[in-house]
From Swiss-Prot:
Its job: Stimulates the secretion of gonadotropins; it stimulates the secretion of both luteinizing and follicle-stimulating hormones.
Coarse class of the protein's main subcellular location: secreted
GO cellular component: extracellular space
Site, as annotated: Cleavage: 8-13, 15-16
Modified residues (Glycine amide): 15
Entry GO MF terms: gonadotropin hormone-releasing hormone activity; gonadotropin-releasing hormone receptor binding
Keywords of this entry: Amidation, Cleavage on pair of basic residues, Hormone, Pyrrolidone carboxylic acid, Secreted, Signal
One Pfam family it belongs to: GnRH
Locations listed in the record: Secreted
Signal peptide interval: 1-5
Protein name: Progonadoliberin-1
InterPro entries xrefs: GnRH (IPR002012), Gonadoliberin (IPR019792), Gonadoliberin_I_precursor (IPR004079)
Gene label: GNRH1
Length: 67
């Protein structure tokens, strides 16, 4: 017999269903965490770098929250 597991994070419930009441909170938490990661990357390197994929992800999540 195989073993299965469920990853629980950001409001996920067993079976992959999301808790609709907490979905916006989850998105806002993700945006905050991505922003913190992007800030860390910004300060660690003094060389000019192209736009970070994390910044793009943050922008996409923020636009979803605004809709």
């Amino acid at each position: 017999e195989g073993c299965s597991s469920q990853h629980w994070s950001y409001g996920l419930r067993p079976g992959g269903k999301r808790d609709a009441e907490n979905l916006m909170d989850s998105f806002q938490e993700i945006v905050k965490e991505v922003g913190q990661l992007a800030e860390t990357q910004h300060f660690e390197c003094t060389m000019h770098q192209p736009r970070s994929p994390l910044q793009d992800l943050k922008g996409a999540l923020e636009s979803l929250i605004e809709e």
